[in-house]
């Protein structure tokens, strides 16, 4: 389950502040920026040296750039006016860029009929107004999905709505008026799905104070399994702002995200049980659709699932693709990583998606023909990036192309036959990835071939699922 917060920070920012400024105000802003980046962008403050490099080091600059890119700001790497203003804006406290170890697996409800109960009522509003605001917030999501929500007055509900102040039993205390607005938990048992609202805020039905309906729509999105969107028009965008509730609508991005988890309103069939539909990991006939590294992890894609294998560790976890990337399709057919850029490319049919820091980039998918493929190429079977040559190899049927990532163009003289230049590797490759110890791992059906690209020969034949201790 993912713990989520909304922060409402009232300080104001002024001036563009270089990271090496020595004034008290500038240092206060830098310290505030560090705390912000630690919370939302994974800045490891303990690793920063306790010197002026703390304020000018590349690590913090990179995190500022990461934040600016995600939130649609001009990427300067500095704590300039617009960046500080965004840092002080009302927002949700879940990190904008996740390290995968922090992500829950498959955070969706495995049923279409979900109950909620309002545990207690804020004195700021009439009970009827609270009931109406919460009911309408749930209705926003039921209008675009097959989900049905029912309010119960007693007993155990799937989602519990609570108004509380200070420490309230979940190890995530509220901090009084003007700080944390609310938090929620992702789908699951126990506290899973519950939404908590800070009683020290002044809850309202209008633009004054804090609008309960708008806050609840955002929090319920998290309760249903949605993360944040980088689309500023989306209700799931990290920052909070009031909009006219009479004309409020979910954005296209919100709708795509929630429907990727639950389908559209016409899909009233029971959600598949993952115990029945998840491929058996140690099935000797198991094959994969795509495989790629992501940092020190290996992702194995199959249908709507992926397995996550951390290098040198025996433990493996299986997740829904939609749990990490709600807007992406199932059935990923090829994938590769450029680790130095924190980029992953995912392919299906004649389209591809770009993932940066585990977040989908806007304005995707794009056509695979933008790489320079001829029109007769309709899909990519497999792809792999070699950092030694800074080239990506694309495998299609019995041929392969080589792409120069620096010049952003295909190398001349391609395509070439796979069998001619990859001795022992046959056509129709299912998946391939590169290992830092000089090997390609080619997957064909239930078999896997360790290939030394320096010696240009197969060095080992394995089962495709040998990475999992099968």
UniProtKB/Swiss-Prot annotation:
The active site is at residue 219. GO terms for cellular component: cytoplasm; extracellular matrix; extracellular region; extracellular space; nucleus. It is found in: Secreted, Extracellular space, Extracellular matrix. Glycans are attached at residues 20, 285. Its EC number is 3.4.24.65. Ca(2+) 1 binds at residues 124, 199, 201. Ca(2+) 4 binds at residues 289, 333, 381, 430. InterPro entries: Hemopexin-like_dom, Hemopexin-like_dom_sf, Hemopexin-like_repeat, Hemopexin_CS, M10A_MMP, MetalloPept_cat_dom_sf, Pept_M10_metallopeptidase, Pept_M10A. A motif (Cysteine switch) lies at residues 90-97. Induction: By exposure to bacterial lipopolysaccharides (LPS). Inhibited by dexamethasone. Hemopexin repeats lie at residues 279-328, 329-375, 377-425, 426-470. Found in alveolar macrophages but not in peripheral blood monocytes. Residues 1-16 form the signal peptide. Binds 4 Ca(2+) ions per subunit. Binds 2 Zn(2+) ions per subunit. The keyword Metal-binding applies. Pfam families: Hemopexin, Peptidase_M10, PG_binding_1. The conserved cysteine present in the cysteine-switch motif binds the catalytic zinc ion, thus inhibiting the enzyme. The dissociation of the cysteine from the zinc ion upon the activation-peptide release activates the enzyme. PANTHER family: MACROPHAGE METALLOELASTASE, MATRIX METALLOPROTEINASE. Belongs to the peptidase M10A family. May be involved in tissue injury and remodeling. Has significant elastolytic activity. Can accept large and small amino acids at the P1' site, but has a preference for leucine. Aromatic or hydrophobic residues are preferred at the P1 site, with small hydrophobic residues (preferably alanine) occupying P3. This is Macrophage metalloelastase. It comes from Homo sapiens (Human).
């Amino acid at each position: 389950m993912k713990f989520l917060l909304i922060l409402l920070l009232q300080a104001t920012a002024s001036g563009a502040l270089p990271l090496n400024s020595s004034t008290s105000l500038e240092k206060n802003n830098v310290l505030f920026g560090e705390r912000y980046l630690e919370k939302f962008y994974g800045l490891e403050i303990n690793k920063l040296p306790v010197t002026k490099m703390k304020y000018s080091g590349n690590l913090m600059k990179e995190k500022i750039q990461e934040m600016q890119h995600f939130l649609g700001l001009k990427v300067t790497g500095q704590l300039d006016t617009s960046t500080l203003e965004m840092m002080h804006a009302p927002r949700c406290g879940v990190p904008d860029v996740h390290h995968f170890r922090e992500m829950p697996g498959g955070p969706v409800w495995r049923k279409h009929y979900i109950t909620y109960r309002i545990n207690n009522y804020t004195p700021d509003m009439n009970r009827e107004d609270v009931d109406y605001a919460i009911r309408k917030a749930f209705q926003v999501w039921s209008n675009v999905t097959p989900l049905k929500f029912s309010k119960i007055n007693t007993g155990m509900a799937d989602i519990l709505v609570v108004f509380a102040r200070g420490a309230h039993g979940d190890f995530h205390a509220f901090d009084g008026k003007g700080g944390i607005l609310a938090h929620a938990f992702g789908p699951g048992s126990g506290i899973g799905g519950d939404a908590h609202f800070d009683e020290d805020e002044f809850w309202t039905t209008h633009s004054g104070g804090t609008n309960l309906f708008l806050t609840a729509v955002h929090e319920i999105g998290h309760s249903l399994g949605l993360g944040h969107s980088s689309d500023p028009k989306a209700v799931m965008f990290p920052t909070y702002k009031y909009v006219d509730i009479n004309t409020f609508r979910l954005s296209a991005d919100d709708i795509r995200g929630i429907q990727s988890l639950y389908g559209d309103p016409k899909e009233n069939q029971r959600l598949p049980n993952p115990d029945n539909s998840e491929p058996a990991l140690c099935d000797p006939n198991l094959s994969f659709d795509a495989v790629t590294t992501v940092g020190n992890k290996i992702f194995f894609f199959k249908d709507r699932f992926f397995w996550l294998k951390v290098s040198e560790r025996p433990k493996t976890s299986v997740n829904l693709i939609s749990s990490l990337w709600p807007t992406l399709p199932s059935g990923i057919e090829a994938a590769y990583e450029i680790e130095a850029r924190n980029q992953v490319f995912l392919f299906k049919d004649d389209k591809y998606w770009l993932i940066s820091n585990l977040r989908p980039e806007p304005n995707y998918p794009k056509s695979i023909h933008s790489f320079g493929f001829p029109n007769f190429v309709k899909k990519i079977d497999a792809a792999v990036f070699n950092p030694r040559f800074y080239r990506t190899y694309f495998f299609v049927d019995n041929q392969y192309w080589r792409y120069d990532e620096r010049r952003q163009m295909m190398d001349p003289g391609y395509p070439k036959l796979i069998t001619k230049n990859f001795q022992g590797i046959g056509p129709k490759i299912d998946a391939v990835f590169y290992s830092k110890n000089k090997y390609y791992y080619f997957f064909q059906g239930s078999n896997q071939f360790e290939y030394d690209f320096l010696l240009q020969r197969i060095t080992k034949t394995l089962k495709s699922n040998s990475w999992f201790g099968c």
